Amino acid sequence: MSEGGGQVSCIFAAPTRLCRWPALIECGVNLTQPLCEWMIQVARDRTLSLAWEVASLLTLSSSEVGLEGVGTIWPSSYSSEESSRNGAEQGRQLSIEGPFQGQNCPSHPAAALPLPMRGESQATSCQV
């Protein structure tokens, strides 16, 4: 195969190792800048394609994945009556749709929840 002046003399078995020297030596690749840019673009396109596949799975309802009757749990912000009076604490609760509709998860004081580490989201656990 010839692409932009570069030549690939074999089939890559590990595409994630394309830009590492061991893979280049094993596969005998003569890379030029256009070929490298083309490979990066192909990798980007594949990554975006996979991201869209995952995103579409996340938007499925419980009935579409065979979990009828389980219901859907949505996070929602709230401020308890006591917190509203003193303005000190704010927490989160879960609003529940489905067979558990009308039941709320127990609220936790904000101080009792561990602070999320950088890059993590804070989750509220609930057992109904």
From Swiss-Prot:
GO cellular component terms, semicolon-separated: cytoplasm; cytosol; Golgi apparatus; nucleoplasm; nucleus; perinuclear region of cytoplasm
Tissue occurrence: Highest expression in placenta, muscle, fetal brain, and adult brain, with lower expression in heart, kidney, stomach, testis, and adrenal gland. In the central nervous system, highest expression is in temporal lobe, hypothalamus, medulla and spinal cord, with lower expression in other brain regions.
Domain of life, per lineage: Eukaryota
Signal peptide (from-to): none
Main localization, broad class: cytoplasm
UniProt subcellular location: Cytoplasm; Nucleus
Cytoplasm in keyword set: yes
Further facts: Was called 'saitohin' in honor of the late Tsuanao Saitoh and his laboratory.
Subunit and partners: Interacts with PRDX6.
Name used for this protein in its record: Saitohin
Organism: Homo sapiens
Lineage, highest ranks first: Eukaryota, Metazoa, Chordata, Craniata, Vertebrata
